[in-house]
């Protein structure tokens, strides 16, 4: 009998290893090129994910850990009170609970990739204990990866701004982004109609911070399961987020349709924490979020109350109870969709993957070896009632405002193979994405989607350069990519400075030389441009008086 127990124990150990570890370390090879970029080879996608985790940890284990701590309510234990709001938010939106409850909605093949990535991270941590920032974070699990992605995408939907406004006793409203002329991303693609030869060009020109959780990490992933992609990813992500394989490539820029809503609950006048929707009473679910402050370097745990309603996570301030609702709260498949995009081999396959409708937002610029170019202002956009102004607080006392459906991929602004031969985006309006007569029309889309309608300096200059050249060869393509010139007239989306160039310098003797230098400037920025330096002085000084420019935000020399 003892022999049978011994054999059974061995079988169980073998079964455990087969079931829980899909990784053969000997199959993984990490080869770094002259720039240090890891080229990671493996038999399976899971093994490549293990290698990606290892290589990224070698280069920046700290940022990966900080990212995972943020999504799993542990960042304040490491950083103290300055990270407490982040931990509070991750718990209010229930990152961990949602990732746990929805984890099995992920495809088993992608779950293997997550398993491989976590094995790589945990093995690195095991062999480098002095680099571990917070022991409680480990072991990393697939659910913890998903929880961080869930948190990150909630923030990318600008829903955190609504939460912050509620906490600060402000009226939370949709605020269009107005700084995309000072930072942002660009993408553009040309097919053979524009290149004049059998060539298709795609510019991937994303602008991310140089460090931190949203800084790019470049890698090349190759498996025998159909993965062969070179591109960039974020800390803790198990696949490439923007890049190119041997068939196609895509880039992202940030877009700004209205993806998050805030509701004012109608509270029962007598019953505590009871709200009323269409005459029916509902009880708020009261919960506690825990976070840390440090006293003499020792973490001390505190708690703060939050609630959930049928609309979503709910907070109380001096004005009442407010709920926030955004599509990322109900879906965890975004990273799986990116992984599938890594492996796409044709436009049809790529487009069908987009139909998963799991990415919460982001413009996509696309090109492939079959001369297909494509642009879409992508997103998981809710279908809302037209009778409400969704840029403001909406009533939380009716099911008419409780949206549950989303626009499908085919219903979003997009352009496929325009006759002009080009598509482009620079964080501006999706209704200005190719030649004028081929653009999507804003009137064809619900106003509740609240898509951007503006141009900016980068989009204006980009279109100028494209239209100046009937044919764009590769040399011209690169010149456009590296262009550093502002358009004439200026096209900031948040202020109009053009009157500056109409001023008469002799009328302003105190700044005559400075003004003359600005007006003679060729609007090209480089390290040796005196005009660019003079304009920068004006730009940053006038910024201090931005609120005094009036509703038009138009610069007046006499203001």
Give the ranges of each region predicted by the language model.
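Internal mixed beta-strand/loop scaffold within catalytic domains of large alpha/beta enzymes
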Residues: 23-62, 161-426, 431-436
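Generic signature of intrinsically disordered, low-complexity, basic-rich segments
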Residues: 5, 15-17, 121, 322-326, ...
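Long, compositionally biased non-active-site segments enriched in small/hydrophobic residues and glycine
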Residues: 24-172, 368-559
């Amino acid at each position: 009998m003892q022999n049978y127990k011994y054999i059974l124990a061995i079988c169980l150990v073998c079964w455990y290893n087969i079931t829980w570890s899909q990784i053969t370390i000997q199959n993984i090879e990490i080869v770094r090129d002259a720039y240090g970029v890891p080229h990671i080879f493996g038999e399976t996608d899971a093994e490549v994910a293990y290698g990606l985790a290892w290589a990224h940890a070698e280069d920046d284990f700290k940022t990966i850990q900080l990212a995972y701590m943020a999504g799993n309510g542990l960042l304040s234990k490491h950083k103290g009170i300055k990270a407490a709001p982040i931990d509070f938010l991750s718990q209010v939106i229930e990152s961990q609970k949602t990732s746990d409850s929805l984890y099995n909605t992920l495809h088993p093949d992608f779950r293997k990739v997550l398993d491989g990535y976590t094995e790589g991270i945990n093995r690195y941590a095991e062999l480098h204990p002095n680099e571990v920032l917070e022991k409680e974070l480990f072991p990393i699990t697939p659910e913890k990866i998903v929880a961080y992605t869930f948190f990150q995408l909630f923030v990318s939907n600008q829903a955190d701004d609504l939460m912050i406004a509620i906490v600060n006793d402000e009226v939370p409203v949709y605020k269009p982004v107005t700084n995309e002329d000072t930072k942002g991303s660009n993408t553009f693609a040309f097919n053979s109609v524009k290149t004049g030869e059998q060539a298709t060009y795609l510019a991937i020109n994303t602008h991310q911070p140089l460090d931190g959780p949203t800084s790019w990490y470049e890698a090349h992933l190759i498996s025998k399961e159909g993965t062969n992609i070179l591109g960039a990813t974020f800390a803790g992500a198990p696949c490439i987020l923007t890049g190119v394989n041997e068939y196609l490539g895509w880039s992202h820029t940030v877009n700004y349709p209205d993806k998050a809503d805030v509701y004012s609950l109608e509270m029962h006048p007598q019953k505590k924490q009871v709200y009323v929707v269409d005459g029916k009473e509902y009880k708020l679910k009261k919960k506690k979020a825990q976070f840390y402050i440090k006293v003499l370097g020792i973490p001390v745990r505190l708690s703060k109350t939050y609630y959930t309603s049928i609309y979503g996570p709910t907070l109380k301030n001096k004005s009442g109870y407010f709920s926030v609702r955004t599509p990322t709260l109900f879906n965890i498949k975004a990273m799986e969709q990116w992984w599938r995009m890594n492996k796409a081999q044709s436009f049809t396959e790529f487009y069908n993957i987009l139909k998963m409708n799991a990415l919460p937002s982001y413009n996509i610029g696309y090109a492939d070896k079959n001369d297909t170019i494509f642009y879409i202002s992508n997103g998981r956009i809710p279908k809302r009632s037209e009778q409400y102004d969704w840029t403001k607080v909406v009533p939380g006392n009716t099911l008419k405002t409780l949206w549950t459906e989303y626009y499908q991929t085919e219903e979003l602004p997009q352009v496929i193979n325009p006759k002009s031969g080009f598509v482009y985006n620079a964080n501006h309006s999706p209704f200005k994405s190719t030649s004028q007569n081929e653009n999507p029309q804003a009137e064809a889309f619900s106003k509740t989607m609240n898509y951007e309608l503006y141009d900016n300096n980068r989009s204006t200059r980009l279109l100028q350069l494209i239209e100046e050249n009937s044919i764009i060869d590769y040399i011209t393509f690169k010149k456009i990519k590296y262009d550093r010139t502002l358009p004439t007239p200026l096209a900031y989306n948040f202020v109009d400075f053009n009157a500056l160039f109409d001023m008469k310098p002799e009328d302003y003797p105190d700044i005559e030389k400075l003004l003359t230098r600005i007006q003679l400037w060729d609007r090209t920025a480089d390290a040796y441009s005196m005009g660019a330096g003079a304009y920068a002085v004006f730009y940053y000084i006038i910024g201090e008086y931005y609120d005094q420019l009036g509703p038009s935000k138009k610069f007046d020399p006499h203001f």
